[in-house]
Structure formats: C-alpha cells, structure tokens
C-alpha cells in the first residue's frame, strides 16, 4: 500500500472493500434548513470537499451536506464514481473530455461544461476506467 495515502483515504478503501457488491447508496439525503432534499445518485454530477462538508452538484444546483468527501466516497459505487482529485469525486458518465491544463495537470470537462481539476493519480485512474 502506498505510504503517502492519508488515513481517511485508507479507511475509505477499507470500507469499500468490506461492502458487499451491489450494496452501494442509491441516493443522498441533504437537509437544507427546513427542507430535506433526496438526490438520486444518477442525477449527481460531482461532489466537492469543503472542509467538513461536501458540496453536491446536481441538475444545476449545489447543496451542502455535513459529511466528509471520504465518507461519501465509501458509500458510492466505484464503477460509477471516481475520485479524480483530493477535493473532487465525479460521476464517470458525466465526463465528456480530459484536457491538459498547464505543464503536468489536467481538467475533466463535464457534460454541463464544468471544469474539474484532475490530479496525476486521478488522471491515471480515469484513463484506466475510460479505456
């Protein structure tokens, strides 16, 4: 195992390995004041870490959920969602293109035109999954 992986990433990997196949979340519930939003995961474009919260982007709206990105990642089906950066998880079928950005960096262009940064490790992972 890579010694550079932070503890939360290792715990997320262990949680995924322990989860039986087909036992991934189908939706995310977000409390927004007095409102409760139920987001089916087939409508989730991406998630972005924001301290101890995660910003969920769906259908042109962004909702904040009190959860870490690692916690969310552990509940998602890895065949549908991929962590492309320490701060981003993206739904694979929303990615339309990968473009170079600067000397050694890349960005993922999503179906709605959003540009999401992709780390070097995320780029390698994406290339494997998209081929």
Roles of regions detected by a PLM:
Residues 119-130:
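Short, basic/aromatic-enriched C-terminal tail that caps enzymatic domains
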Residues 2:
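Active-site-proximal cofactor/substrate-binding loop regions of enzyme domains
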Residues 7-117:
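Conserved binding/recognition cores within well-folded domains
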């Amino acid at each position: 195992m890579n010694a550079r992986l932070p503890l939360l990433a290792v715990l997320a990997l262990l949680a995924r390995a322990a989860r039986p196949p087909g036992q991934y979340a189908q939706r995310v519930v977000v409390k927004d004041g007095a409102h409760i939003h139920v987001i089916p995961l087939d409508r989730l474009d991406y998630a972005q870490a924001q301290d101890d919260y995660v910003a969920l982007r769906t259908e042109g709206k962004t909702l904040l959920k009190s959860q870490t990105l690692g916690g969310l990642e552990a509940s998602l089906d890895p065949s549908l969602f991929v962590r492309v950066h320490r701060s981003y998880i993206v739904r694979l079928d929303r990615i339309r293109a990968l473009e170079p950005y600067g000397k050694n960096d890349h960005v993922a262009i999503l179906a709605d035109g959003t540009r999401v940064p992709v780390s070097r490790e995320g780029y390698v992972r994406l290339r494997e999954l998209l081929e």
